């Protein structure tokens, strides 16, 4: 299921049924620029809708940057759980680097009314084998062969997520996030077939990530230009036979 809506998200969310959403994943406007689309949504009516539509154990994961993130956390401190730090690899702020450090990170604040649905995405890591050791899966001895590499799937998630923000011209929105980062967060808090809501979807990256991971998606965007871009990006990401596209 894909449902894309154009308009004011505070009005559009009123049509979303109670407790029908498994995760809210949104890059809200931070209010740090003079751009028309970068206007902070009032927290009180926003949380009223979020709390109504999200399921009891569903995650509300919201991107931010200071000072916006502090205001966001304080707007619902009772349900705040923790922050992820997104390491963008490519820093921004070169123009003002003589006054402040260049910024290489953004924040993802996670909220929930109860115990979070949690599917930790364990990272694969390579470890060279030296000498005679046993397999962790079947206790069978492995041959002496220094330099052999085995892959382990047991590195627990850490609070810093490293996903490079491309600079190759593929970005169509100034605050567009990497698809892989959104996929990681979606897999962490939902299962296949569950529903993700993005009420400020911009160019549709969350929707693309949902299509790639087999999730249902509800997307909302007020800007007509970006709504059209999001529609096309999400449609193009659907794996359909050519005759259905």
Question: What residues fall within each predicted segment?
Answer:
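Short, conserved SAM-binding/catalytic segment
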Residues: 231-244
